Amino acid sequence: MNINDNLSINSPVDNKNVVVVRARKTDTVFKAFKVAPNIWVAPERYYGESLSIDEEYKVDGGIYDSNFLSQDSEKDKFLQAIITLLKRINSTNAGEKLLSLISTAIPFPYGYIGGGYYAPNMITFGSAPKSNKKLNSLISSTIPFPYAGYRETNYLSSEDNKSFYASNIVIFGPGANIVENNTVFYKKEDAENGMGTMTEIWFQPFLTYKYDEFYIDPAIELIKCLIKSLYFLYGIKPSDDLVIPYRLRSELENIEYSQLNIVDLLVSGGIDPKFINTDPYWFTDNYFSNAKKVFEDHRNIYETEIEGNNAIGNDIKLRLKQKFRININDIWELNLNYFSKEFSIMMPDRFNNALKHFYRKQYYKIDYPENYSINGFVNGQINAQLSLSDRNQDIINKPEEIINLLNGNNVSLMRSNIYGDGLKSTVDDFYSNYKIPYNRAYEYHFNNSNDSSLDNVNIGVIDNIPEIIDVNPYKENCDKFSPVQKITSTREINTNIPWPINYLQAQNTNNEKFSLSSDFVEVVSSKDKSLVYSFLSNVMFYLDSIKDNSPIDTDKKYYLWLREIFRNYSFDITATQEINTNCGINKVVTWFGKALNILNTSDSFVEEFQNLGAISLINKKENLSMPIIESYEIPNDMLGLPLNDLNEKLFNIYSKNTAYFKKIYYNFLDQWWTQYYSQYFDLICMAKRSVLAQETLIKRIIQKKLSYLIGNSNISSDNLALMNLTTTNTLRDISNESQIAMNNVDSFLNNAAICVFESNIYPKFISFMEQCINNINIKTKEFIQKCTNINEDEKLQLINQNVFNSLDFEFLNIQNMKSLFSSETALLIKEETWPYELVLYAFKEPGNNVIGDASGKNTSIEYSKDIGLVYGINSDALYLNGSNQSISFSNDFFENGLTNSFSIYFWLRNLGKDTIKSKLIGSKEDNCGWEIYFQDTGLVFNMIDSNGNEKNIYLSDVSNNSWHYITISVDRLKEQLLIFIDDNLVANESIKEILNIYSSNIISLLSENNPSYIEGLTILNKPTTSQEVLSNYFEVLNNSYIRDSNEERLEYNKTYQLYNYVFSDKPICEVKQNNNIYLTINNTNNLNLQASKFKLLSINPNKQYVQKLDEVIISVLDNMEKYIDISEDNRLQLIDNKNNAKKMIISNDIFISNCLTLSYNGKYICLSMKDENHNWMICNNDMSKYLYLWSFK
């Protein structure tokens, strides 16, 4: 789809792409710009809301500014920002299909007859008399278009109401609250009855916020609004009252449920629908069946009355045709989770609104195109350099609760705010009142495939549909917009026991001069608020231990200090403790109790947790509500049925009961998810905020120290500049350690939630299920016993076939349930921590060799065009022939420093014999960094820091012309250097003396004097363990090994029989002919032909297993050992002299793993066509593929 980007606020009105139109039901006019067919942008505040809002109606977290978007310069920036976002959405196939569908999905037109209008659910009268027979006939037959008249509802009208412009959506600026995005319908009735109605979107493109470590992408926020617009355009909007319980909010005696609108649930996607809406769907409502019916009704009207009606323009018909190419389920399955993957956008996996209660959003400014382009954030979602908005000071502060922490004298120590989640709440227990229906069919089946629901959207066809120029307007196409305003109140709670929110607040400070303290009471009692609560015991001990030391006045002292701050922070924040439990929790985050006063403990959290169990971490511990169920009574009219008919009907009932058990199961599952897991999720969120608060404190301490040295020390400007760069990288490394801590929290609390389910919920559930099953079994047996037309044996047969003998249902299996929970709850909100910084690949194209990086880090690569490729250990390898060839990899991730751990591994085959020093790979600047080079027939790994401290490790035994797997692991936390050759640890050295190795962001792979093969060069941002080295080494080797017929590794010097793939039951034998011995299959059942015994001989005598592209000699064991040669007629023959034997290349088959190929001089060894009584082994490339395949048994 073409997005019109040739527009500005000053573009002249042309009544085509730039128009002045009237807002619905008002006298307001605005300038609108058509950016795509039926898609308009109005760079104005939304007209439907007053920009002057009384304080009591302002919502918590909102920002109100009546002057926003009032200047033409702002309006132009808004227009360009929306165009940029639409172009970004349009840049992927999925996004282009979404926009094409929105452009096409026009509301259903109204029928017109003699001054009256008709829609399937509505008729109004103009001047036509009511006795008109044709009109009455129309009404009774419900045919909307007998006379080909129609009126359209999707249009904008000019100021004088004489010109009309087709429109499906209009994107405005925000309404009164400038940080609220919204999607509103034009006409409520048509939004729900299948007719469809156009949509208005309010949108704020200039402000975003952070979620964990990444910024929310405005493109995904706009996609959310666009998806919602389809519900209005198709007329399938559900009732506003269709809500489901989302999470329990339980504080002291107050218990409320947050409720989530069904559209928000469907559109958000992610984890929530997998539990709340898992098929079969236990929560039934008429919405799904009714919406599907009105959708099908209108598609049927289109197909029968419009598609073939030549009096209706193609601009209308073709759009309706494309609109109805998709099914209603396709719309229900459009969600942000799908689009986030299509755009590689990070987003929360749970509905965003439910995350606001534990912290306050801070908004960041987005400047287009400086910070954001059609490719997204210029520096990525995590590293985007966005400034905090000045508007944060205007955020409305209306907490849901205020927690007053009082001391023993009832003096207030602190006030902490708990904010709402933006959702409606209710005190009604949905589950205790909801009756699970028995006979209702499943309302909606989710599509579990990975296929796009937009597959039926044909972009090419849609692009060629003529635009709607002449609009026949239906004047009653809209309702007056009525904004919903509500008054919110705040309740206050007094407590002497600190709540988690109190502890969380104590970890934040605005004081520039602060000190860390582990004494919470001391912190909240301090008069000047200079103390900040921290649970980082190692950090505080270190800071206390050096307070009397001499001041830091050199770069080396600063590096030593900075390194220790980093190491101690890492030890504190990533600390866990192994424990033993009966339900799978084997690791506890030790600081969790200290951070949030969980269990009201200090150092004894782990012990208390072991004593009280995982249930002790949350407030609600009551039993789940037993669902109200219906039971199916077997009708008495079945008593007289013949045996077969009776058995069939009883089996149908049996199947219905099984499905009903599933409904009960999902009801329990949903209660657990809503009432129990939601509380653990709250703890996860608060614990992560605590991690980020501690991280912020440590970073402020570091930045304060660096600022002081920059302004007050005698350190040279060059060294200060280097210290500044190094500190930036260390701050990044601190964030990485925080992410590890947050992952630990995820794992711990998710496991705790699963433990509660297994220990507290599942037994009650199974007990209830047993009651249900027993009751059904009793009724079934009683009914069968009452059947008088069958004998006792037949009754027993029916009982055995139609009663439930046990709870042996797959969906009741606890292990299956735990696997489901583990897969869906692990790492719910995480930064995508892909550890690979460089993954080198190479492959051949016709006339060109391609070298690239598969890490996804957008590495810039420059390389000599004459670098050759050869087949390596497992794929194409680089051939550096020693003629000053080079490859340069550039990426900010490659910058080293003081605290970053990293690993390097690659496969190397050294072809050189020289002893002269020859560089291989490195990252150095101003003689600082790391490097690997050849020297004295070995390999040297060198590290040198900015202060001249150096470490050199010499590695021998890599110059024997064989492949070796080189792994180098630099662990800055353990101050340890590990080096492996193949699967052997050859160096374990301390690097405590090595400080800052800051170097450029370039890694160079060189070939100065030494020819070599390099394959699989990989750089990781973490150290590598011995177990990982072994795993990597043998994984690659396993892929490269040739396999025998049993999939075992083929061995040198081991005796085998040889078979051809085509004749897999006939071994290769020896046949004498003309004083020569040739090889053939025994296809005559000649008992004198015995299977030959083969042995593979390696060129390398130390090699045990055969690998791809090895050169091999094949010997045949007879009375004396013979060797394979190739005769003049290309047959394989046996000779006595090993020196004259042919060296063949052995490889495996990609598709048949236990088969191999043999080749000589580029020709394959194959089996000939039958020659008299023989199929000879020959060297020839003209045979069928499968005749080239061999197998050793």
UniProtKB/Swiss-Prot annotation:
Disulfide bonds join C583-C755. SUPFAM superfamilies: Clostridium neurotoxins, 'coiled-coil' domain, Concanavalin A-like lectins/glucanases, Metalloproteases ('zincins'), catalytic domain. GO terms for molecular function: metalloendopeptidase activity; zinc ion binding. InterPro entries: Bot/tetX_LC, Clostridium_toxin_transloc, ConA-like_dom_sf, Nontoxic_nonhemagglutn_C, Toxin_rcpt-bd_N. It comes from Clostridium botulinum. The record marks K133, K134 as: Cleaved during long-term storage, protected in M-PTC complex. Residues 830-1193 are annotated as: C-heavy chain nHC. Assembles with botulinum neurotoxin type A (BoNT/A) and protects it against pH-mediated inactivation or protease activity at pH 2.6 (the pH of the animal gastrointestinal tract) but not at pH 6.0. Necessary for neurotoxicity. Residues 409-829 are annotated as: N-heavy chain nHN. This is Non-toxic nonhemagglutinin type A.
